[in-house]
Design a protein with these regions (language model features):
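Soluble periplasmic/extracytoplasmic beta-strand elements of cell-envelope proteins
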Residues: 59-64, 77, 132-136, 149-153, ...
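N-terminal segment of the mature soluble domain
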Residues: 56-125
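Surface-exposed short loop/turn segments
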Residues: 29-47, 112-160
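C-terminal/domain-edge helix-coil "capping" segments
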Residues: 29-50, 176-206
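C-terminal motif of bacterial Sec signal peptides marking the signal peptidase cleavage site
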Residues: 24-27
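Bacterial N-terminal signal peptides that target proteins for export
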Residues: 2-17
């Protein structure tokens, strides 16, 4: 009789454990939110429906675009203090951030420059490019006050000659809690960078 009771108690404990584990897994599944993905835009407030020149004019190479290691990840980065950052794991970039920045600029710069003769890095060695725009992103985040900031060191080169080498800083009001507003503000900063590149590059294409 004692052996039978012991056997039944063990079975009861086993089923109780499995039942609790099942409820725990179901609870975690219900409470976890799906990851949301975002893309930057470099054409905020810009009309991209401009007539482009075809197979004439100099060829422009966009890139490479380089990021510091702390930004080279899919999770979004938010500044908690001047020297402290946190990752927002539930909100991520839809692709590598350097590729996202490159694509966003590539989609809007041709219309602003009036030419479709632009290729993205890396490009074939031949025929090569006449002008190259290189960008080093030094800062791209939202600070503890909800201010988005983009700091970029960028240059325009022609063959082996550097025509312009400049550091630019752009800001836009974002949010400390609303991810959509953060991405919108970062897109506004990227748009400003693209406009500054156009102002300096367009006169060289004539």
């Amino acid at each position: 009789m004692n052996k039978m009771n012991l056997y039944l108690n063990k079975r009861l404990l086993k089923y109780t454990f499995l039942l609790c584990l099942t409820f725990l897994i179901l609870g975690c599944a219900k409470s976890s939110k799906p990851v949301e993905y975002y893309m930057l835009d470099a054409s905020v407030g810009i009309d991209n429906n401009q007539t482009l020149k075809g197979d004439e004019g100099p060829m422009i190479g966009l890139g490479p675009i380089r990021l510091p290691e702390y930004l080279d990840r899919f999770q979004m980065v938010v500044a908690v203090s001047e020297n402290k950052y946190k990752l927002i794991d539930g909100h991520r970039w839809a692709e590598k951030l350097d590729q996202n920045i490159s694509l966003a600029l590539f989609k809007t710069l041709p219309s602003q420059l009036g030419t479709d003769r632009m290729i993205r890095y890396p490009w074939p060695q031949r025929p090569g490019v006449d002008f190259q725009v290189k960008i080093d992103i030094l800062e791209l985040n939202v600070d503890q006050d909800g201010q988005s900031q983009l700091v970029a060191q960028w240059s325009i080169k022609s063959k082996d000659k550097t025509i312009l080498n400049k550091r630019s800083t752009f800001t836009a009001q974002a949010s400390t809690t609303d991810i959509d507003k953060m991405v919108q503000a970062q897109s506004e900063c990227l748009t400003q960078l693209g406009q500054e590149i156009v102002v300096n590059l367009k006169p060289l294409l004539k």
